[in-house]
C-alpha cells in the first residue's frame, strides 16, 4: 500500500476542487495512483451530482452585472440557506451574471453551454454540486440592452432589481431600484397589470361587496373602487415613493425630468414550493447517506 502524503492530497484537490477527505479516500483506493484517483473522484462527484439533481432548490441568490449598455439579473438556487452564503456559490453566481450580460444567451440551456473557466457553465455547476453536496441550479435570468441608463439594486442576496431609465441624475435609477425591492410592484403602470391578477382581485372584491347586503349598483361601484385601488398599489408609477411619502414615483420622476422604461424584480425562491422535512427523518437520512459513502 503506497503512502498517501499531504502533498498528494493537496495536488489532487487542486486538480478536482474536491474536499480534502474525498481526495484522501480516492488516493487510498487508487493505491497512490494520481491519475486513477482523479478518475475515481470525478466519477464519485458525478454520482453526487446525479443524486442531488432531484432535490428541491428553493434557497439561493440573486446576482447582477452591468457593463457598457447591457445589464443582467440572474437567480441561482440551492437547497439550503447555509449554502447560499458559500463563497464558491456566490462567486459562480457573479460569473454567470456577467456572462448573461456580455454573451446574451437565448435561454438557460444556452447559458449552461457557454464557456467558463476552461470548461462550460454547466460543467462548473456540476463540479460545485459535487464539492458542496447540494443540488444547484440556474433558475432564470433577464438581460436589458439599451442606449438609456441602467441601474441595479441587490437587497442582500435574496432580492434583486434591474431598471432601465432616462435622466441626468443617476441617483434616480438607484432610488427607483431600491423602491422596487421594497414595494415589489408587479408592473410599470396600471395598464400593464396582468389580466389574471386583475381577475383574481375583482373576484375577491365581488365576494366582499356581496356580503355587504347593499344594492347591486352600490356593490358594482364598491368592486370597481377596490380594483382601481389595487391597480394603484401594484403599479410602480402610482406607488408612493418610499423616500418621500408626499410623492408618487411618477411625480418624483417628472420632477427630475426622468422616466422609467422597464424593470425586472427577482425574489429568491418565489413560486417554488419548499420541501418540509421532519427533523428526525432528515437526520436519519443524512446518517444513511453517510454510511453509503
Curated annotation (Swiss-Prot):
Cell compartment(s), UniProt: Cytoplasm
Record-level GO cellular component terms: cytoplasm
CDD domains found in the cross-reference section: UBA_EF-Ts
Xref: Pfam families: EF_TS
Keyword line: Cytoplasm, Elongation factor, Protein biosynthesis
Molecular-function GO terms, alphabetical: translation elongation factor activity
Positions of the UniProt region annotated as Involved in Mg(2+) ion dislocation from EF-Tu: 80-83
Main location per the UniProt record: cytoplasm
Function, as annotated: Associates with the EF-Tu.GDP complex and induces the exchange of GDP to GTP. It remains bound to the aminoacyl-tRNA.EF-Tu.GTP complex up to the GTP hydrolysis stage on the ribosome.
Family, as annotated: Belongs to the EF-Ts family.
Protein name: Elongation factor Ts
Originating species: Paraburkholderia phytofirmans (strain DSM 17436 / LMG 22146 / PsJN) (Burkholderia phytofirmans)
Amino acid at each position: 500500500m503506497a503512502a498517501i502524503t499531504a502533498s498528494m492530497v493537496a495536488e489532487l484537490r487542486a486538480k478536482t476542487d474536491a474536499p480534502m477527505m474525498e481526495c484522501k479516500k480516492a488516493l487510498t483506493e487508487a493505491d497512490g495512483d494520481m491519475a486513477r484517483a482523479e478518475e475515481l473522484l470525478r466519477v464519485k462527484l458525478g454520482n453526487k451530482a446525479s443524486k442531488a439533481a432531484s432535490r428541491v432548490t428553493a434557497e439561493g441568490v440573486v446576482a447582477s452585472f452591468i457593463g457598457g449598455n447591457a445589464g443582467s439579473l440572474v437567480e441561482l438556487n440551492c437547497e439550503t440557506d447555509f449554502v447560499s452564503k458559500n463563497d464558491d456559490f456566490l462567486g459562480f453566481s457573479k460569473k454567470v451574471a456577467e456572462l448573461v450580460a456580455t454573451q446574451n444567451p437565448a435561454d438557460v440551456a444556452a447559458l449552461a453551454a457557454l464557456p467558463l473557466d476552461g470548461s462550460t457553465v454547466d460543467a462548473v455547476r456540476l463540479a460545485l454540486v459535487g464539492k458542496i453536496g447540494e443540488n444547484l441550479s440556474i433558475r432564470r435570468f433577464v438581460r436589458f440592452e439599451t442606449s438609456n441608463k441602467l441601474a441595479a439594486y441587490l437587497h442582500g442576496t435574496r432580492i434583486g432589481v434591474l431598471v432601465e431609465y432616462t435622466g441626468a441624475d443617476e441617483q434616480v435609477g438607484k432610488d427607483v431600484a431600491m423602491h422596487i425591492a421594497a414595494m415589489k410592484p408587479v408592473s410599470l403602470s396600471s395598464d400593464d397589470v396582468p389580466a389574471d391578477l386583475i381577475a383574481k382581485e375583482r373576484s375577491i372584491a365581488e365576494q366582499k361587496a356581496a356580503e355587504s347586503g347593499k344594492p347591486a349598483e352600490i356593490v358594482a361601484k364598491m368592486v370597481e373602487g377596490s380594483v382601481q385601488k389595487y391597480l394603484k398599489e401594484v403599479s410602480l408609477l402610482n406607488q408612493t415613493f418610499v423616500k418621500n411619502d408626499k410623492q408618487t414615483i411618477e411625480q418624483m420622476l417628472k420632477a427630475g425630468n426622468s422616466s422609467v422604461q422597464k424593470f425586472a424584480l427577482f425574489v429568491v425562491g418565489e413560486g417554488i414550493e419548499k420541501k418540509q422535512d421532519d427533523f428526525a427523518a432528515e437526520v436519519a437520512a443524512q446518517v444513511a447517506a453517510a454510511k453509503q459513502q
